[in-house]
């Protein structure tokens, strides 16, 4: 399977990226709609593990 770099890929087949971002940094656009996401250092490969339910990225409550 050929892997392509995409800004957002909420899929189990998404490549596990380097540089685990458990919460949004505010500097990674791939984490805009996620509370938990995986992104590489460049922010090229990202996967949303848990979509945010609030308007603030990083809010856990």
UniProtKB/Swiss-Prot annotation:
Disulfide bonds join 17-31, 24-37, 30-48, 34-57, 39-46. It is found in: Secreted. The keyword Chloroplast does not apply. InterPro entries: Agouti_dom_sf (IPR036836), Spidertoxin (IPR004169). Residues 1-13, 60-61 form a propeptide. Pfam families: Toxin_9 (PF02819). SUPFAM superfamilies: Agouti-related protein. Expressed by the venom gland. The keyword Heme does not apply. It comes from the Eukaryota. Keywords: Disulfide bond, Knottin, Neurotoxin, Secreted, Toxin. GO terms for molecular function: ion channel inhibitor activity; signaling receptor binding; toxin activity. One of its GO terms (cellular component) is extracellular region. Coiled coil: none annotated. The presence of a 'disulfide through disulfide knot' structurally defines this protein as a knottin. Belongs to the neurotoxin 02 (plectoxin) family. 02 (plectoxin) subfamily. Potent toxin that may paralyze and/or kill insect pests such as H.virescens (lepidoptera), S.exigua (beet armyworm) and M.sexta (tobacco hornworm). This is U1-plectoxin-Pt1b. It comes from Plectreurys tristis (Spider).
